[in-house]
Amino acid sequence: MLTGLLIGTSYIPFPPWALLFCHVPLWIFWLREGSIRRVLWGGWLAQFLFCLIGFHWVAYTAHEFGQMPWPLALLVLLLFCAFGHLYLVLAGLSWAILRDRLGLGRTQQLLLLPVVTAIFHRYVPLIFPWNLGYPWLWARLPAFQLAEFVGFDGLGVLTLFLNLALLAAWERRKERAGALILGGTAAFLLLFNWAGWAAGRGQPVPDAEARVLVVQGNVGNFEKIYAEKGLGFRDDVVGRYFRLTAQGLRRAGERAPDFVVWPETAFPEVIRADRMDAEYTGALRSFVRIGNVALVTGAIGHDEAKRKPTNAMFFFDRDGTLR
């Protein structure tokens, strides 16, 4: 349970306060357990809890966008938590089988823990992929710059081995070796973050920049549905985005943006290349021309091959031309 709580409360959007030891309680449990069944149960419980904390928004998504009643949306969340991250269960199973079949010693068991965890996290499919490398960036720890060389997957694997180092220090806590391992880990962290800082300082100065105005209309989901189906709200939604964009352009003054971005499905009309003068699409093109600014917007498009509407993104040039 403790590992589930530590991972869940150390991942984005929380500060990574337990990132370097979040797996330690689960690994200690695995090391102490001789029963494969209990190893599996420990892994499942840990993944269930961190799913419940980190992916609680699944219930809201099912309710808001799936239009499910709250009891059913909560059931969807519980089902996701039960099966969403079985990589931890499979890692525990593999570790226990290898331990028993090969008769591994204590040191070998310890080294195997981050290896199987990293392998199964990498190769077991996840509905929402994530890894332990991203919190380095979220917390702006200098070491995140090293993702340029090892990737965030690499940072995630390194984080698992740092968990192993702290586990080893805990195992030897009554010996001088424990203090040495702990001190060595702290020194490595300082060196690693210094290397990240140096890598960041060594980045070349950008040779170009783009100024972007991002507009969020905060349109409710049901308003979008009604607008897209032509049941009302279109004038209000379009007017809201026009108004907010115009305000942003005025505030920008001389630092005019290179282009404006509207979010997914912001524009409440199907945009088709053969109907560019349709009521709202025509108004949109006129707005772009008058504002003299390029626009990237999410909207409903039309898949000509399948003859079906599709979620799409459109780019309008300053003269209102669809690119």
Describe the function of each predicted region.
Residues G196-R323:
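Soluble catalytic regions of membrane-associated enzymes that act on cell-envelope
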Residues M1-G200:
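Membrane-embedded alpha-helical bundles of multi-pass enzymes
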